[in-house]
Amino acid sequence: INIKGEKIMPMQMGFRWYGEGNDKISLSDIKQIPGVTSIVWALHNKMPGEVWEVEEIAEVQKQLEPYGFNMDVVESVNVHDDIKVGLPTRDGYIANYIQTIKNLSKFGVKVICYNFMPVFDWTRTDLFHPVGDGSTALYYEASRIHDDPKEMADYILNNLNGLTFPGWEPERMAKLDELFELYRPVTKEKLWENLKYFLEAIMPTCKECDIKMAIHMDDPPWDIFGLPRLLVDAESVDYFLKLVDDPYNCLTLCSGSLNANPKNNVAEIVAKHCDRIAFAHIRNVKHFENGDFSEASHRDCDGDTGILDILKAYHDCGYEGYIRPDHGRHLWTEGPGNVRPGYGLYDRALGIMYMLGVWDMLDKLEGK
């Protein structure tokens, strides 16, 4: 029962999986993590703008069914650059996106995570930074972000161990100079306009198919390399939800993305917009005085994000959406050459157990 006295479905714990042949973690491994009911998936061979065909989606369903996982959440159906820039060709790519939504609905998908970040997806300067306990983690060094963006892109691509990463497609990164030129005239105001155009075009289909579009926060939450960022703080989240005020226009609220800026109070945003959060990412970051930050374990005291306050805010509002541990350290045998940066097995599994332990205790304190 939520605070309105309504009967709801319980929060569903998810685990991001990159697919057979593209993820060193198996579905059998994930099945052994208590509490996981949902595989957060995507067709990682698809380029932005392409239609996800029914036959391709059915193949993923076939892989998940023996393990009893649902495929309710897709992360991500990436948005083509022509839509973000607002080129005349965008309507064709929007039509493809609409067809993909319709095809996904045939398989019970409920949430599509996406982002509207120009050129780059998440951005880090070190993928295997020593934490101090023998593990490594994703790290952002503020002084290096002003260097050549191509150098940073090459570093990331060269350390993906041949694995895919949405937003870092080699085909796109090979045209980095062209992409920067494409986005050069796009102001923050224009990017907001183009996002609104995209959402207004797809909302009728989302309602028809009962699929929520859940935008991911910009990571990190500030402009980089002269490129504008939109979802960066509480004010911009408010603006986004009013921009297209529709129950199918929702958030993927990523605690670590927002709290890379220590001024952002994620728990307050959760409390204010719980009904518009379709998907929750729980990530912990440690801040440094020079503007650097490191990703940390999910344990509250290991970072500065306020994980306990955030989980309590979700619990207090009767959160009924999907949640997953977002990023983790690389532990024990994991390291360069054998793990997708930020997406090892062990620390994310530990994070799930921490999150569920907190949730169980909150339930117990409420007498559930």
What are these regions (language model features)?
Residues G5-G14, G19-G21, S28, K62-E65, ...:
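Histidine-acidic metal/acid-base catalytic patches
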Residues M9-G49, E56, Q63-G68:
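Ligand-binding pocket scaffold of soluble enzyme catalytic domains
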Residues G19, L43-H44, V77, M117, ...:
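Residue-level "edge-of-site" marker
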Residues T37, D72, I277-A278:
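A short, local hydrophobic-aromatic micro-motif
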Residues V40, V73-V74, P228:
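Generic secondary-structure boundary/loop-capping signal
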Residues N45-E193, K207-E208, S257, H315:
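Structural motif corresponding to the early beta-alpha repeats
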